[in-house]
Each structure stands twice: as C-alpha cells, then as structure tokens.
UniProtKB/Swiss-Prot annotation:
InterPro entries: HTH_17. Belongs to the EUO family. This is Early upstream open reading frame. Pfam families: HTH_17 (PF12728). The lineage of its organism: Bacteria, Pseudomonadati, Chlamydiota, Chlamydiia, Chlamydiales. It comes from Chlamydia caviae (strain ATCC VR-813 / DSM 19441 / 03DC25 / GPIC). It comes from the Bacteria.
Length: 181
C-alpha cells in the first residue's frame, strides 16, 4: 500500500513540475491537426500557411505551432496589408507601393476607374500574383497628366454651356468629375 501511495505522490509531483515548466516557457505548442480544429480549417490550409511563411511553426518530429503565432495568423489571415508575394510585403507603403483601393482613396476616384486605367495603360501598374501594385511615382504621374487635364476640360465645358457661370460655380468634387465616363 505504501508503494502505491508513494508512486501516486511522485506522479503528482511530476505533473506539477511539467506544468511549471510550461508556464516558465510561456508558450503552448499545438500540432497542425489541433490548429486546424481550433480554427475550423483543414490541416492542408494550416500546412500551406506554414509553407507560405504566413504562419510561424517549428518542426522537430512533427510540426509545432505556438498559440500566440496562431492567433496572429488568424487576425491577419485576410488582411491585404499583410499580403505577401514571394516573401515580400505586397503593398509596402513605406516603399511607395499601393493597392488599387488605396490609390482610389488617395485620388478620390472610384475603384473601377483605377482598374480601367491600369487595364488601358493610362496608369501603369504591376501584377503580383492576383493583385495590382501601383507605385507612388505612377500615382503622381497619373494625377498630374490625366486627372488635372480632365478637371480643366470639365471646367471649360461648364463655361461653354453656361457663359455667365463663375469659376466658383464650376467647382466639382473628385468623384463627380468621373461619373458617366
């Protein structure tokens, strides 16, 4: 009887030590299968995220993922700002690269107008995977060469239609200029 009690005491001590080690490390690791179950995705989706370097994991005998990294991945999974192309940020605003939506917001024009400008070559953009990436210099060029000319053209049309109109009457918002184009 005494041996059994001693063994159970040692088991409890071992469990407490193991829990203390986990707390000291501050990291709880999960497998690909556990990560997939936690986020209601397939194991393949987790594996692909690891291979694309969107999810940090380490491989000893099996893949192990830190729960903190898994939560970071979940938060940024669908974020276009964090999108990577061949290991680099796709829309790195610090380097002057912007998405179509960002360009549309900057110029005050509809998103479809930016897509049309890139397809027709009026605004040069680069395809990286499925996304268009537009540089700051190209945005500035498009704004000065194309948008400013359209503004002047619209103002002249108003002046011809209404000769008594003052320049203040011919002021338009950025989006009104491009309706019905």
């Amino acid at each position: 009887m005494e041996c059994i009690q001693h063994e159970s005491c040692f088991d409890l001590d071992d469990r407490e030590n193991a829990q203390q080690l986990e707390v000291q490390e501050g990291t709880e690791m999960v497998s690909i299968t556990q990560a997939a179950k936690l986020h209601n995705v397939t194991r393949q989706a987790i594996y692909v995220a690891i291979k694309q370097k969107k999810l940090k994991a380490s491989k000893t005998t099996r893949w192990e993922i830190d729960l903190k990294d898994l939560e970071d991945y979940k938060r940024n999974r669908y974020s276009r700002k964090k999108s990577l192309y061949q290991g680099e940020l796709l829309f790195d605003n610090d380097k002057g690269f912007y998405s179509v939506n960002q360009v549309a917001d900057m110029l005050g024009i509809p998103v479809q107008k930016v897509y049309y400008a890139t397809r027709t070559g009026t605004m040069r953009g680069e395809r990286k995977g499925a996304a268009w990436v537009i540089s700051q210099s190209e945005i500035d060029r498009y704004k000065s060469e194309y948008l400013n000319k359209q503004t002047v053209k619209k103002m002249k049309e108003v002046a011809v239609e209404h000769p008594t109109a003052t320049p203040a009457d011919a002021v338009f918002s950025g989006t009104a200029l491009f309706e019905n184009d």
